Amino acid sequence: MANDYISFVFKSLLLLIHLVFLGQHHVDSASVVKSLPGFEGPLPFELETGYIGVGEEEEVQLFYYFIKSERNPKEDPLLLWLTGGPGCSAISGLLYENGPLTMKLDVYNGTLPSLVSTTYSWTKNSSMIFLDQPVGTGFSYSRTELFNKPSDTGEAKRIHEFLQKWLGKHQEFSSNPFYVGGDSYSGITVPATVQEISKGNYQCCKPPINLQGYMLGNPITDSKIDGNSQIPYAHGMALISDELYESLKRICKGEYEHVDPYNTECLKLLEEFNECTSKLYRSHILYPLCEMTNPDCYIYRYSLSHYWVNDETVRKALQINKESIREWKRCDWSKPYTKDIISSVPYHMNNSINGYRSLIFSGDHDFEVPLIGTQVWIKSLNYAIVDKWRPWMINNQVAGYTRTYANKMTFATVKGGGHTAEYKPDETFIMFQRWINGQALYGKVKLLQKTE
């Protein structure tokens, strides 16, 4: 009997030790990364990678990259950057849009692709968290089978929980001004996340997150508004004829997204429209449409990141949890996801009422989410214009156009820009720098430097 009792106690202790170990493993999984394969020498910035568990049992493990501000991390803003998709990895933002590293554009020869420093990183004046979300994106994963698939509203809650836990482990940043940013499909999740954080600050969560505002680039906002803007945009950019445009307006009555199936004349005109535009690279209409494996194509850089991230030495350096090891994809469109926010306009309205400042910017050569639609929903908020439409300048050259509204919202175009910040990274960096510092976009700035 005594032996049975001793055996029971011993097994219980082993189980307790095992549970404590598991708890520690999932509570503290952050790692400082000093160097990365493909980059010469130590990293010239402070990088941390890790997992934060969310959900009742912390079954969802969200992977993040955190880079401290290169200026004054104790006081500079903290920015959470969400890549669109849904299902596009945070690496897209980090290596192509606004991070301190990018791929060296050499033709792949079977060896590990190289990384080089950028001169346009937003981390020059803010700390940044690049987050792999929703679950299944990048290196984020679930330790158990999920009964509820990710959704727009569900992600807003998960991201809020992630932030609370992340700041709990990084309390030195809890008083820094906090912003949420992203582009493309993040136009749905970012406004909802801002509202969720704002509600949490008032209702449930202490200490409050020092939320100040948000920014979005070429944001998907309302499928009807965004979709209906593509035809007038195509006409304005001389992609379709005046005759076709006038016929579309008259026969389809401005409704191009949800066409009456009995309106055969409209459907026929839309077929003609698609014939004119189907061979365009929609993310930037001036770029050629070609295969990702073509070294002469813009999107070849995405192939390089695929080779780099899927290298075993890179995953080891990033401290990737073995449970999440699988083939990394820049964007995985196959994951189940519920799009339960039809329009994020009401979220913008609520965030405006609550006083949060915002920056909405549009690359003016994006055919995916044309700037025309973005201007339509901004106008629907019905706020007075504070600063009239005017050019914003870099080195005495027009970099785009901008105006501001009474709800602390700034709208800006990026001249020659595309669907994401990556097409004009120098210009978007200057734009972000001015806005985050509370300056007017049309102010003065230092000379631009070129990417190394």
Swiss-Prot record:
Gene Ontology terms for molecular function: serine-type carboxypeptidase activity
EC number(s) reported in the record: 3.4.16.-
Positions annotated as glycosylated: N109, N125, N350
Record keywords: Carboxypeptidase, Disulfide bond, Glycoprotein, Hydrolase, Protease, Secreted, Signal
UniProt-listed InterPro entries: AB_hydrolase_fold, Peptidase_S10
One GO term (biological process): proteolysis
Keyword match Cell membrane: no
Primary site of residence: secreted
Compartmental location: Secreted
Active site: S184, D366, H419
GO CC terms: extracellular region
Top-level class of the enzyme under EC nomenclature: hydrolase
Lineage: superkingdom: Eukaryota
Disulphide-bridged cysteine pairs: C88-C331, C252-C266, C290-C297
Tissue: Expressed in seedlings and roots.
Keyword NAD belongs to the record: no
Any one Pfam family match given in the protein's UniProt record, by short name: Peptidase_S10
Signal peptide: 1-29
Protein purpose: Probable carboxypeptidase.
Similarity comment text for this entry: Belongs to the peptidase S10 family.
Full protein name: Serine carboxypeptidase-like 6
Encoding gene, per UniProt annotation: SCPL6
